[in-house]
Amino acid sequence: MVQLRRTITTNKVFQAITSTNDKVAHFVVFMWESWLFVKMFAEDIVTFRKLQANKYVLGVLICSLCASVTSEFAQSVVSRGQRVFDVKDIICNFWGSLLGVGIAFYQDR
């Protein structure tokens, strides 16, 4: 696993792709991830133990807010400091995620 992580973060082709299209990649990946997250629930209301929540609200809370910010901190650890925290990445993550949840909502209606 460590070798795989080292290969991904030091691969020159991977670095060239992500450096030129970094913000687009963040936007598209979070849009896709959020869409998948919402679509994995068959019902609009998700029940966990005694708690109930709307799957679209969960998508916004978990994907748009939590994952958007957490991923920026995690990438610094995963890349062993080669990638740094960037507020613009969080903004792209957030808006991509919102669009993904919005597309899922539109498709379900």
UniProtKB/Swiss-Prot annotation:
Keyword terms, alphabetized: Membrane, Transmembrane, Transmembrane helix
Chief localisation class: membrane
Membrane topology: Single-pass membrane protein
NCBIfam families for the chain: vanZ_1 (NF037970)
Pfam family, one: VanZ
Organism of derivation: Saccharomyces cerevisiae (strain ATCC 204508 / S288c) (Baker's yeast)
Record InterPro entries: VanZ-like
Keyword Membrane in record: yes
Keyword Cell membrane attributed: no
Subcellular location: Membrane
GO CC, any one term: endoplasmic reticulum
TM stretches of this protein: 90-107
UniProt protein name: Uncharacterized protein YJR112W-A
